[in-house]
Amino acid sequence: MKIAQIQMAVSADKETNLRRAGELLRQTAAGGIDVGVLPEMFCCPYDNKCFDAYSEPEGGPAQQALSALASELGIYLIGGSLPEKTDGKLYNTSYVYDRRGHQIARHRKVHLFDIDVADGQRFFESDTLSPGREITVFDTEFGPMGLCICFDFRFEELARLMTLRGARVLFVPAAFNMTTGPAHWKLLFRQRAVDNQLFTVGTSPARDTAASYTAYGHSIVCDPWGTVLRQCGAGEEIAVTELDLERLDAVRRQLPLLSARRTDLYRLETEN
């Protein structure tokens, strides 16, 4: 399965961002890919002051553009995330489209990014956004895939539940910052890959030091052994990676962590 991560620069103009996403996806799809992945808030500055103004309802123009791109290019498209407004509430939402442009998944960020690091980053998504309430795993011709957004990925229970629901790859549109990125970005993607014996794919916006929130960049792919297969730099970049899904099965046979769990002693429970 060949994936393309679009680590794009995000401007203050929504239409410009949508056009740029299309340009970069068309550029890489010409070489043949199966899945395109955009970053968190790819069409909106990551700023509480912007989320409402840039938001759109379910089926809005940005979503229509993503659907059309997936159909035009014949790819699965993980549309990063964008501000969605439904029933007066704002969500940080990722939409997924199949090769025909049909929406096959929607993930609303479950864990809102509320942090205040001494001498570092301060941000409170809960000032404007509401949390989602669903764990997201979707089917493809390559098997089930998991999807979460940025801060969601820090919670090991969520990754494990997606794994137990069959996910073979965890796709994570994310915008870590210059406080948390250098400290935790690579560590977390390797850790989740090793713990759950699957591929992890983190796709960030490009770094913009003039923005009110500076993304770390360094989009990353790790395999089920924790090996970093690909890592971008800080600027705008397209990263194409071939995922050998048989590698996942081999690692799980050789080091059978999931089947060795003592579910008679411990287990995860969810309330639906």
Walk through the language-model features, giving the residues of each:
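Short beta-strand scaffold segments in enzyme catalytic cores
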Residues: G79-G80, T93-V96, T136-F138, S219-V221, ...
